[in-house]
């Protein structure tokens, strides 16, 4: 079953664009947790690339032959879904929000 790449990438782009840090997500992001493909996906979208072109551009930059694109597509979908469902990114956002709330509570407590 071939998954709709536009849906997956659009969903991923929405998650990345929703990050509070905005542009430069890759620089402010715990990159050590990312695999190479995930990092490249985030980097491409972070550069204001059109999300619909991300898959094709990565396939070209990885020199994936036409006959191997289906296999690469499955890897791409898995990486995009991991990022979008947010095993990584949403945890980062949640931790940032929790950290800021904790800081606010501490500030209020000491006033």
Functional labels for PLM-detected ranges:
Residues 2, 18-20, 62:
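Residue-level detector of functional hotspots within protein domains
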Residues 9-40:
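Short alpha-helical segments that sit at the start of domains
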